[in-house]
UniProtKB/Swiss-Prot annotation:
Gene field: proB
Annotated GO biological process: L-proline biosynthetic process
Pathway in which the depicted protein is active: Amino-acid biosynthesis; L-proline biosynthesis; L-glutamate 5-semialdehyde from L-glutamate: step 1/2
Broad class of enzyme this protein falls into: transferase
Task of the protein: Catalyzes the transfer of a phosphate group to glutamate to form L-glutamate 5-phosphate.
CDD domains (alphabetical): AAK_G5K_ProB (cd04242), PUA_G5K (cd21157)
Protein name, per record: Glutamate 5-kinase
Reaction it catalyzes: L-glutamate + ATP = L-glutamyl 5-phosphate + ADP
Family under the similarity heading: Belongs to the glutamate 5-kinase family.
Disulfide topology: none
Location(s) in or outside the cell: Cytoplasm
Keyword hit for Amino-acid biosynthesis: yes
Binding site for ATP: 19, 178-179, 220-226
UniProt domain PUA: residue ranges: 285-363
């Protein structure tokens, strides 16, 4: 590390979530690259030495399981992936434990599923655990519990999980390490004229189109899912960096004034804790489709959502559950806790608030989703 690099790094203690994809941990091979993993551990140790806190989200369980079993020929199905994850998770955590042990650092394993984030109480318990580990100078190493979770072994699992972990621990920065140098104007593997995008202030449809599709054979994430994760994290006030895991000092440089890769600036107004949970925690159980007037009121004025602006309801959700709010073209506008079940809401779509009680026979308030329970997604 050069003197200039040291001078460029922020001195104020920060919490950094480091997400390591399978391609980074294997170097594109079929086995864990322990030589590179020890270098990543060294960089995390250097951050801690400087007074910063580190939380790691580590993929690689399936790759570790495949290696330990001698690369068996298994059917490409969920049960095979869960088998490999069950065998490999212990191997992965043992590897990290031995590597961090070189630097005198203790680690703690946390395996999460969507259910741990859907429920508000379990979400808070997970938050307390991860914060307790950090407070006791232990690096939490988080992974999805792929051995039992069926919906998580899909594109975007640990990318999105890392954003949620960032919200759990109140991170200042989220570092998504991959096999690419960052987000480019086109796929650099196909277009020699592709240019690295150094800084992103707003994530729009153009960027989503650039990000494209899926990941590698061993991993499940691609650039599109990293963009999803970046969007979630930055809305919670977390700065996000997508960079190459093979780049020298990439983890330490994440705290510099000019980090490597693509830097996503956080939204200017960070969400309060309850809204962070609405954004990150529960999976939406259905969609509430609203008209243009309601979109303008919710997005432009920060208003609550009224039944008058609802066009249609899809899915099945109970009162108090989270629903997606979309415009008439299906574009996501917001997420929020519905005061009415999907069954009740279907009966009062397009109706004035004063008519709700006469239609339903009961009334949970004039708002379908109160603005305090609503997180705007559209910018």
């Amino acid at each position: 590390m050069t003197t200039n690099q040291q001078n460029a790094v922020v001195s104020q203690p920060q919490t950094v979530v480091v997400k390591l994809g399978t391609s980074v941990l294997t170097g594109g091979t079929l086995a864990l690259d322990r030589a590179h993993m020890v270098e990543l551990a060294r960089q995390c140790a250097e951050l801690k030495k400087q007074g910063h806190s580190v939380v790691m989200v580590s993929s690689g369980a399936i790759a570790a399981g495949r290696e330990h079993l001698g690369y068996p020929a298994l059917p490409n199905e969920m049960a095979s992936k869960q088998l490999l994850a069950a065998v490999g998770q212990s191997r992965l955590i043992q590897t990290w434990e031995s590597l961090f042990g070189i630097y005198g650092i203790k680690i703690g394993q946390m395996l999460l599923t969507r259910a741990d984030l859907d429920d508000r109480e379990r979400f808070l318990n997970a938050r307390d655990t991860i914060n307790a580990l950090v407070a006791n100078d232990i690096i939490p190493i988080v992974n999805e519990n792929d051995a039992v979770a069926t919906s998580e072994i899909k594109v975007g699992d640990n990318d999105n999980l890392s954003a949620l972990v960032g919200i759990l621990c109140g991170a200042d920065k989220l570092l998504l390490l991959t096999d690419q140098k960052g987000l480019f104007t086109a796929d650099p593997r196909k277009d020699p004229n592709a240019e690295l995008i150094k800084e992103v202030k707003t994530i729009d449809d153009t960027l989503r189109k650039i990000a494209g599709g899926s990941g590698t054979t061993l991993g499940t994430g691609g650039m599109a899912t990293k963009l999803q994760a970046a969007d979630i994290a930055r809305r919670a006030g977390i700065e996000v960096i997508i960079a190459a895991g093979s780049a020298p000092n990439v983890i330490f440089d994440s705290l510099s004034t000019e980090p490597q890769g693509t830097r996503f600036l956080p939204c200017s107004e960070a969400l309060e804790n309850r809204k962070r949970w609405i954004l990150a925690g529960p999976a939406a159980s259905g969609d509430i489709i609203i008209d243009d007037g309601a979109v303008n009121a919710v997005v432009g004025k920060g208003s609550s959502l009224l039944a008058k602006g609802v066009i249609k309801v899809s899915g099945d959700f109970a009162r108090g559950e989270v629903a997606r709010v979309t415009n008439s073209h299906g574009k996501l506008v917001a997420r929020g806790i519905s005061a009415y079940s999907s069954e009740d809401l279907a009966k009062i779509t397009g109706k004035h608030s004063k008519d709700i009680i006469s239609i339903l026979g009961h009334d949970y308030g004039s708002e379908v989703i109160h603005r305090d329970d609503l997180v705007v997604i559209q910018e």
